[in-house]
Amino acid sequence: MRSIRTRTTSRASRTSGAAKAAAAALTAGALALTLTACGGGDGKDKSGKDTSGGGESSSASVKLPKLDGQTLEVAAVWTGPEQDNFTKVLKEFEKRTGAKVNFVPTGNNTATFLSTKIEGGKPPDVAFLPQVGVLHQFADKGWIKPLGSDAQAQVDKNFSAGWKNLGAYKGKQYGVYVKAANKSLVWYNTAAFEAAGISKTPKTWDDFLSTAQTLSDAGSPAVSIGGADGWTLTDWFENIYLSQAGPEKYDQLATHKIKWTDPSVKEALTTLAQLWGKDDLIAGGRKGALGTEFPKSVTQTFSGDTPAAMVYEGDFVTANINADTKAKVGTDAKVFPFPAVGDKAPVVSGGDVAVALKGGEGAQALVTFLSSTDAAEIWAAQGGYISPNKEMDTAKYKDAVTRDIAKALLAAGDDFRFDMSDQAPAAFGGTQGVGEWKGLQDFLKNPKDVAGTQRQLEADAAKAYKNG
C-alpha cells in the first residue's frame, strides 16, 4: 500500500512473532466463496429494507469531551474520494465535541512529510501511518504518544489481538488500525467480459493470462495498471510471491532474512513478466501504465469509450468507482480473488494506523473516536472502506460486495499476512522514486531484466535495512 518504513531488531522479531500472527493470508477459499456469492450489491436485505447505513449510529457508543474553541489537524495520505469520505467522519467528531478539525494530505511520502513537520515544530495532532515500520521509527524517536485510557478502552473492546499488536511497540499501544485493506482483489468490467464471451472468472494465473488474451483479442485493453504510483507495483509482486513462494518465504523476504537475489524472487519476477512483458495486454502498454496513477487506473476500467477490462487493487477501489464513474459496484463492477499462482490463492492485507503526535486532550479524543464503532459505521456507509473493528454493524457498509469482503476479514481473526513493503524500511518499501517502488517501475519498463532487477532491489534493500 502507499507505504514507508524502518526496522529494528525488536521489530523484526515481532514481525515473525506477533506480526507473524499479524501477517498471513485471509482464508482465500472463504473469501472466494463470499465474493462469488455477492449479488447486485444494492445494499438491501431480502425484505427490501435499506441496510447500507447512512451516517452516525442511533446511539453513541463512546463518550467524548467538549473541545469548544480547539482546532485540531489530522494528516493522512488520502485524496479525492477517500479524503471526502473520511471528512464525513471528522464532521461527526466536530459536531459532538465542538472542535474544528482540518485535514492535511501528506502525499505518497508520508514519513518524509511528517518528519519535516515534526522537526519544524509543527506536527499535526493526529496522523495516519500507512506502514507499521514508521510507527516503530516514530516511537523510537519519541514523536508519537501512547494511547490514553479512553482510547485504549476502545481498542481493547473493538479489535482482535492481531490488529492491536500491529499498533503496539515495546509494550505500549501507540496506535490503532482503524482502516484495513484486502489487497488481493481483481475488479472487472462486466460488460467487457460479456462482450468477449467470458462467463467465468479466472482461478489460476494461467487462467488469468488466458482471460486477458481473450479480452484483448475482443478489443478491450485487458489490464489497467497504475504504474506511476510505485506502491501498486509492490502489491502485484507481493501477491504473486506469497502464492508462489509461500508464507514462510514471504516472512523471510519481508524481514530481509533472505536476499532479493534469492531464486524465489527470480521466479516471481519471471511470472510477473508474463503479464508486464506483453504490451497488448496492458491498457496503454507499459509506457502508458508507467504514466498512469492509481485513481486513473480505476476510472479507465469503468468509464470512457474503450474501458479496460480489469484492474488489480484493494477493496478501496470502490471509493473511486463510486465517486468517479457511473458504474455500480456489484453490477457493472464486480470482483474476484487474485488468482492462484501456486497451490493457494494469496490474500495480502494492509491498513492505516492512527497515532497521536501531540499530547493534548484533543488528539487523544480524536483517536478515541476513530477507534469506536460510531466512526467505523459512518465511514463504512460512504464506501471504499473496510474496518478491522469487530464490534461494528456490518450492515452499515455501502454495498454488499464490500460488506462480504469486510466479513471475510473479520472471520480471519488474527490469521492474516500484512503487506510486505509496509514492513520494510521507509527508504526501501515506501518512498516514491527510490527502493522497491523505483525498482519495480524499472522492471515494468524492461520486464526482460530479471537478474538486473534482483541485483538493484537487493542493493537498495541491504542499504535501507542496515540504516533502518
Regions found by a protein language model. Name each.
Residues 2-35, 39-136, 378, 452, ...:
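Conserved N-terminal structural module of periplasmic/extracytoplasmic solute-binding proteins
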Residues 4, 385-386, 391, 406-461:
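C-terminal capping/gating helix-and-loop segments adjacent to ligand/active sites or protein-protein/ligand interfaces
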Residues 60-66, 132-184:
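Hinge/lid segment of periplasmic solute-binding proteins
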Residues 64-66, 148-159, 227, 244-267, ...:
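Short, solvent-exposed loop/beta-turn-alpha elements that line the ligand-binding surface or hinge
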Residues 105-113, 132, 205-210, 286-300, ...:
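Short helix-initiation/N-cap motifs at beta->coil->alpha
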Residues 174-178, 184, 209-258:
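Extracytoplasmic/periplasmic solute-binding protein
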Residues 247-323:
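Extracytoplasmic ligand-binding clamshell segments of periplasmic binding protein
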Residues 322-386:
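Extracytoplasmic/periplasmic substrate-recognition and gating elements
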